[in-house]
Amino acid sequence: MMMIMGRKCEDCGNQAKKDCVYMRCRTCCKSKAFHCQTHIKSTWVPAYRRSHHKHQSQPLSTSIPKGVQIHTTPGHFPAELSSLADFRCVKVSSIDDGKEQYAYQTTVNIGGHVFRGILHDQGLHKVMVDHHYNKNSNNHQELLTPSTSSCPLKITSPFTDFMFGTRFSSVLRR
């Protein structure tokens, strides 16, 4: 039994489309800029454009851990989420007494909306709140004692609690 093979592309040897008058595959026909009616009608999109289009149509999720998808509708946000954020150490002062304190400023993007805020020092807290961690997990965190001699520039943390509307006096640079 003899098998009838399709036409081969004259340039690369791949299978040519049977109606192509130039006897080329799609890629070679397009790359040589032939005005082939068979390939013009085709809905084929080059691989580099497909992946580029796919990345453009998907929402960015840099602040959401891999495997977690948060779908937000306009005006509706998740009651709670966990994300990574960079915190900058800043000096803040109260309008009432003018006393300077250290705080951390951050900005996060949730569902395309930008949230910016400052975390104020609430004093020492030795008990971790089970609100953010599963009681059965083996997550251990060391509590750091505050030090007035050093203030790190960046800290990565999964917490995103804010006090809005607070002004800060200057950003510490070290």
From Swiss-Prot:
Origin superkingdom: Eukaryota
Predominant subcellular localization, coarse grouping: nucleus
Gene: SRS3
Motif segment (Required for homo- and heterodimerization): 110-113
Taxonomic lineage from the root: Eukaryota, Viridiplantae, Streptophyta, Embryophyta, Tracheophyta
Subcellular locations according to the entry: Nucleus
PANTHER family: PROTEIN LATERAL ROOT PRIMORDIUM 1, PROTEIN SHI RELATED SEQUENCE 3
DNA-binding residues: 9-36
Source species of the chain: Arabidopsis thaliana (Mouse-ear cress)
CC per GO annotation: nucleus
Family designation: Belongs to the SHI protein family.
Known function: Transcription activator that binds DNA on 5'-ACTCTAC-3' and promotes auxin homeostasis-regulating gene expression (e.g. YUC genes), as well as genes affecting stamen development, cell expansion and timing of flowering. Synergistically with other SHI-related proteins, regulates gynoecium, stamen and leaf development in a dose-dependent manner, controlling apical-basal patterning. Promotes style and stigma formation, and influences vascular development during gynoecium development. May also have a role in the formation and/or maintenance of the shoot apical meristem (SAM).
Name of protein: Protein SHI RELATED SEQUENCE 3
Gene Ontology BP annotations: auxin biosynthetic process; auxin-activated signaling pathway
